[in-house]
């Protein structure tokens, strides 16, 4: 006799265990974790990464989240929001730290301390892939073969040093193509900024001696270099070579000027970054001063995101300042040269581990120290004062910014102060090299890391069709936004869009945004006054009569700043595109003329114009140029 299944038995296959959340989920995960170093990620309901952490023992660290003994409510909130966890084991704890740093920068978790506006720094490179090494500014990955020196805190700092090096060591700064095409010295030789190796006015060995002196100076041997030059000047004077002595005198003066301009030149610090943290009112500022070759190469202030960051459940003795400085240093040096010495006002948590990780990255010992007395302590105190002042300025600006955004909301009848404002402008010359620019602003001011430029691609636009250009820019921008939102990516949706122009530009913007289904975003046209007078701007809002703001209104000044910044950015992008277009060499358009033949032709005739004037008979004399290619080149310059 066959048993008849009960109702409860029939329902059993349909019944599923409730998904685990929060502490229960973490407790379940712990049972499968190894007692090994690694990185863990806490995942939220929308598959967003809430937190990234590292551990010497994944099992021992993660179990603490399930035990309920939380240092602050922030950890409790993070645990409650966790619906999944992911783990990566590593060979050592130092490897885990490096991976944690990389993932935090990549994923930007809500509960981690996060370094914002982390831009690369300019450096100086002495190229080593040419008989006459070139001195130049560089930013980004070290793709050029040569010796790199930096970082410099700003373009101004690196340009000042380059200017000094040119005066003192007379090294070339021109590109290889310009160098190879010279048959007489350029203006830099005339003003004593280059020794003209391109034309043989200085021998190879003598030029290399200048390169060696420049390298020694950049490596911190400035006193030895200046002493050598002073001795050479005295010898020249004794031998009555007064012109050579005067040149050496000018070079020494140029080097001396650097020490005076950098203001802070410590005697006991050759190579170090000095880092100071100040925390106040739920905000933080980290000032970094760069010292290389015994000189101050500039400084920069950072304002890491610390609101919402979770504390370390493993060690309640770790202070907030220690957590912030540890996270900052890790993220800051993730993609930057690490100095041999880092001086700080706060001892990082796990300082020895951080030093070990930095040593792995840099291939040499890295010391992190908190000096208590002497010149180094004075340096740290000076940097801390700068951090405190910078945070004070930012907090004052933030308070004023909040009022301005509230005023913008009132002026344009928005439901709330805008968190993200996007401003658009175009720049071109009669339609040529047209570029659209987008700048972004919000409660923290201009968000320059989110600026975007749009090279106008349409070939159907009438030259100078500003409406058509604006449509293309907005279509590309908001089509991308729609795609990001559909795919669940971290999309940046603006609360307010400002377009430079009146009713026509506003209508163009509304048309595109309606087509893309983003017409819930507020759009305003900003038209300049008669004769482009500031203060007479008119504002265009859909369904409303154009209006003006009070001439001395702070909100009007703010909107003018936004418009001017968009204009500046668009013009800069246009000039860059136009400059690149002008630099295009017509030889690049000729089939069969590659880099080698191009170089040979320029060397033989000095310039593309010289090539264009050459006869077929002259062209075939150049190495690698056949009769057929010579005729093709000759015909190219004479077509039309």
UniProtKB/Swiss-Prot annotation:
Keywords, ordered alphabetically: Cytoplasm, DNA damage, DNA excision, DNA repair, Excision nuclease, SOS response
Annotated protein name in UniProt: UvrABC system protein C
Residue span(s) of domain GIY-YIG: 35-113
GO molecular function: DNA binding; excinuclease ABC activity
UniProt-listed Pfam families: GIY-YIG, HHH_5, UVR, UvrC_RNaseH, UvrC_RNaseH_dom
Family of the protein in this entry: Belongs to the UvrC family.
Cellular localisation: Cytoplasm
Domain UVR: 223-258
